[in-house]
């Protein structure tokens, strides 16, 4: 068996969720300059006791939270409009970003790639939201530091029309659909039969 490992992150794409009831998405848009992605799932397990023994074990998937960091979400009109929609901001008639208050951010699918030593991986989180970014800007010293934009991210599980419930799906470079992974968000996810998995 070959030894594999995943290295870095690239190819971030975002697809705005158009219809939360039907789970239809806009075409994924590539976002350049991915620096870092941190993901922390939130899965809680609780045991109820009765008759002096464990009675029911219940696990609940609450999605998760983390941070996605980019060097560039503002260099084009399209990126500024996309991220304004994602954080609940607006664009004015002159093309400026307005830090609007009280507007609901749009939900979206977040897609990215981790190259591998032998096998690469691409992942899609289906129902994400972000907040306006934090950043740390400082004077240029001996070397220029590019300002990094850090977006707090949350995601949650969804139930698709196929009956499948979950938060994300992965594809791998040895699978047939890998080359077209970023073409669209796949919402026709179904479980393999026992014979297909064996």
Feature annotation, model-predicted:
Residues 1-37, 194-198:
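Polar/acidic, low-complexity leader/linker segments enriched in S/T/G and N/D
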Residues 30-66:
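N-terminal interaction modules that seed assembly of large macromolecular complexes
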Residues 46-54, 87-97, 133-138:
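Short acidic (Asp/Glu) patches
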Residues 53-78, 145-158:
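Oligomerization/assembly interface segments of phage tail-like spikes and tubes
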Residues 62-104:
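Ordered, amphipathic secondary-structure segments that act as subunit-interaction surfaces
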Residues 70-74, 114-118, 129-132, 155-159:
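Beta-strand elements of well-folded, non-transmembrane domains
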Residues 99-131:
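Short helix-loop boundary/capping segments
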Residues 128-198:
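Mixed-charge, glycine-accented linear interaction segment located at domain edges/termini
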């Amino acid at each position: 068996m070959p030894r594999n490992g995943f290295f870095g992150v690239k190819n971030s794409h975002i697809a705005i969720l158009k219809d939360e009831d039907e789970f239809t998405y806009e075409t994924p848009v590539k976002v350049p300059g991915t620096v870092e992605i941190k993901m922390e799932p939130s899965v809680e397990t609780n045991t109820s006791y009765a008759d002096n023994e464990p009675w029911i074990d219940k696990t609940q998937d609450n999605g998760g939270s983390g941070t996605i960091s980019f060097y560039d979400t503002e260099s084009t009109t399209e990126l500024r409009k996309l991220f304004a929609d994602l954080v609940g901001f607006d664009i004015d008639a002159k093309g400026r970003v307005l830090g609007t208050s009280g507007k609901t951010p749009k939900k979206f699918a977040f897609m990215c790639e981790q190259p591998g030593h032998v096998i690469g991986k691409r992942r899609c989180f289906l129902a994400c939201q972000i907040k306006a970014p934090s950043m740390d800007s400082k004077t240029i010293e001996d070397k220029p530091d590019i300002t990094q934009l850090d977006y707090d991210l949350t995601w949650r599980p969804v139930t698709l029309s196929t009956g499948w419930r979950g938060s994300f799906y992965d594809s791998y470079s040895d699978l047939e659909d890998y080359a077209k992974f970023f073409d669209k968000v796949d919402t026709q996810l179904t479980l393999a039969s026992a014979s297909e998995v064996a």
